[in-house]
Amino acid sequence: MPNYTAPVEDMMFLFDKLRNNKNYNDLEKYKEVNSELVKDILEEAAKINQNLILPLAKSGDENPTVLENGVVRTPPGYKEAYSKYIEDGWTSLSCDPKYGGQGMPKTVSAFFDEMLSSASLSFKLYSELSIGAYNCISHHATDEIKEKYLPKMVEGKWSGTMCLTEPVCGTDLGLLKTKAIEQ
């Protein structure tokens, strides 16, 4: 089984250095965020990543997600782990409280993302596009669209996706041809 120990103390060192930055401390929305709260969050994050997500790393590497007869089948253990992941509120860590988020600084969610990536990158990728979709909607959508989509995304009931326009790959770069001409 793979081994991973979340570097909580290193993360706390970084958080405390950032927290001591006067500009960061002056942000009203983070007035209640302190080292004790962040350490508690990171210690819980370490537990879920080391005890629940890490054991899935091999399963995710060896059992790809497949579409069978219109049904998506994920690697063994993923469905249960994702249910626990959303039940514990990890999808909402740095999301706006207006939509059900916890309102933590992006720094805290970056620490969690590092743990999640280290424990099982394949599992992390299930939520990755949702974060991007959440950010896109929260920064650019109308209030009506935000009210419709963001609460369900924050709750983990709806997820985001990437819509690729190229039929053969995720980018057109592979279709480019270059030629070197001596000058």
Residue spans of the language-model regions?
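Short acidic, glycine/serine/threonine-rich loops at helix termini
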Residues: 103-108, 135-139, 171-176
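Contiguous, well-ordered alpha-helical segments that form the cores/surfaces of helical PPI scaffolds
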Residues: 106, 110-114, 131-136, 162
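N-terminal glycine-rich flavin-associated loop
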Residues: 125-143, 170
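Glycine-rich, Trp-frequent "lid" loop and neighboring beta-strands that shape
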Residues: 94, 102, 144-183
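Residue-level "edge-of-site" marker
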Residues: 98, 129, 166
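Short, well-ordered loop/turn and helix-capping segments at boundaries between secondary-structure elements
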Residues: 20-21, 118, 135-143, 155, ...
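Amphipathic, small/basic residue-rich leader segments at the start of a protein or domain
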Residues: 1-125, 144, 148
